[in-house]
Design a protein with these regions (language model features):
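Glycine-rich phosphate-binding loop and adjoining helix at the ATP-binding site
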Residues: 4-107
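Glycine/GP-enriched mid-protein hinge/lid loop-to-helix segment characteristic of carbohydrate kinases
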Residues: 6-10, 15-20, 78-89, 95-174
């Protein structure tokens, strides 16, 4: 529960290219170098990424999917430190559970409404992944009777009306 340093790279755009992966690794290296912590004492690095993620295999199903190795293993081999990969909303949920206002609770639901819509779930002090590992990805549930095609390819998903992207689109149309 001791935050040593924070780093935000607001100019960063996550895309599925080698240059993007290199930037991620450079940001991690810069963070470690300027943290004031001896590199040998770092047990691991947590990386959260938007979209579907399998933390057990270390794979992202949205970014860097064409690479043979899991994203977690690629980053780990480049920086020389063990890496844990997690979905961004689940990571935020767990951070809220362990260090935020929900510390005294054993069950937490964290709603994230950004460019997409998702929830993170903690049950009995553990992140909940569901049967297929994607619990909380409810932004792509058909919810509206509209003809708006979602990023996932379906029509009428919750994200087509209430996500950050949907709100931006509505403002542009005004």
């Amino acid at each position: 529960n001791n935050i040593i340093k924070e780093l935000t790279d607001e100019s960063f755009e996550l895309v599925d290219r080698p240059q993007c992966l290199e930037r991620i690794c450079q940001n991690i290296e810069h963070f470690i170098a300027t943290s004031g912590v001896d590199r040998d004492k770092i047990l691991g690095v947590g990386v959260s990424i938007v979209g579907r993620v399998n933390p057990e295999t270390g794979r992202s199903y949205k970014y860097f999917t064409s690479w043979e190795e899991p994203l977690r293993d690629i980053i780990s081999s480049r920086i020389g430190i063990r890496v844990m990969l997690e979905n961004d909303t689940r990571a935020r949920c767990f951070a809220e559970y362990t260090t935020g206002k929900s510390q005294k609770e054993s069950n937490v639901i964290y709603l994230h409404m950004g460019r997409g819509v998702a929830i993170g779930i903690v049950i009995d002090g553990k992140l909940y992944y569901g049967k297929n590992g994607f619990a909380g990805e409810f932004g792509h549930i058909p919810f509206f009777d509209n003809e708006i095609i979602c990023a996932c390819g379906k029509k009428g998903c919750l994200e087509t009306e209430v996500s950050g992207i949907a709100v931006e689109d509505k403002i542009v149309q005004l």
